[in-house]
């Protein structure tokens, strides 16, 4: 398992491709080791889930509105049944403000459509400091391939 000890090949592929599709063992551990190696190499890392992402570009880079969840049948009364919109800061705003390269590790990437995955790939190509790792499923051993190749398959 020399890969898990150094992470050099993973980092080299991430720098070259900018976005990787990862298939990690379901028991976990591999992603935290790689995140630790990337942080030691000077990257800022963000870990998030792909569930509930909505518009990826607005969620990651722009100021966007979020409504509170609807909790079922409510009497309207004086208050509206729909909560008021709250503005939420972009998730990657503070990380991209610094000069360091940023790695966004997205868990449960298999729930994203191919169009959403393509928009994440385009976002990485547009923003030079942003690198993305998208977990697309489980595997018996850690393996990865470029996200562009995963989209083509």
Swiss-Prot record:
Main localization category: membrane
MF-aspect GO terms: oxidoreductase activity, acting on NAD(P)H, quinone or similar compound as acceptor; quinone binding
EC number: 7.1.1.-
GO CC aspect terms: plasma membrane-derived thylakoid membrane
Transmembrane region(s): none
The reaction(s) this protein catalyses: a plastoquinone + NADH + (n+1) H(+)(in) = a plastoquinol + NAD(+) + n H(+)(out); a plastoquinone + NADPH + (n+1) H(+)(in) = a plastoquinol + NADP(+) + n H(+)(out)
Superkingdom field: Bacteria
Location relative to the cell: Cellular thylakoid membrane
Membrane topology: Peripheral membrane protein
Alphabetically ordered keywords of this record: Membrane, NAD, NADP, Plastoquinone, Quinone, Thylakoid, Translocase, Transport
InterPro entries: NAD(P)H-quinone_OxRdtase_su_N
Family the UniProt entry places it in: Belongs to the complex I NdhN subunit family.
Role summary: NDH-1 shuttles electrons from an unknown electron donor, via FMN and iron-sulfur (Fe-S) centers, to quinones in the respiratory and/or the photosynthetic chain. The immediate electron acceptor for the enzyme in this species is believed to be plastoquinone. Couples the redox reaction to proton translocation, and thus conserves the redox energy in a proton gradient. Cyanobacterial NDH-1 also plays a role in inorganic carbon-concentration.
PANTHER family recorded: NAD(P)H-QUINONE OXIDOREDUCTASE SUBUNIT N, CHLOROPLASTIC
Subunit structure: NDH-1 can be composed of about 15 different subunits; different subcomplexes with different compositions have been identified which probably have different functions.
Protein name: NAD(P)H-quinone oxidoreductase subunit N
């Amino acid at each position: 398992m020399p890969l898990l000890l150094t992470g050099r090949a993973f980092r080299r592929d991430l720098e070259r491709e900018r976005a990787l599709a990862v298939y990690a063992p379901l028991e976990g551990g591999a992603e935290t080791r790689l995140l630790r190696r990337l942080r030691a190499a000077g990257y800022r890392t963000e870990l998030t889930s792909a569930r509930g992402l909505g518009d990826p570009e607005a969620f990651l880079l722009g100021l966007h509105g979020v409504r509170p969840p609807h909790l079922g049948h409510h009497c309207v009364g004086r208050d509206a049944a729909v909560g008021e919109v709250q503005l939420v800061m972009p998730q990657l705003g503070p990380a991209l403000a610094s000069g360091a390269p940023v790695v966004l590790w997205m868990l449960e990437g298999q729930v994203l459509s191919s169009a959403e995955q393509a928009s994440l790939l385009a976002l990485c190509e547009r923003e030079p400091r942003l690198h993305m790792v998208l977990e697309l499923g489980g595997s018996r051993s850690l393996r990865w391939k470029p996200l562009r190749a995963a989209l083509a398959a």
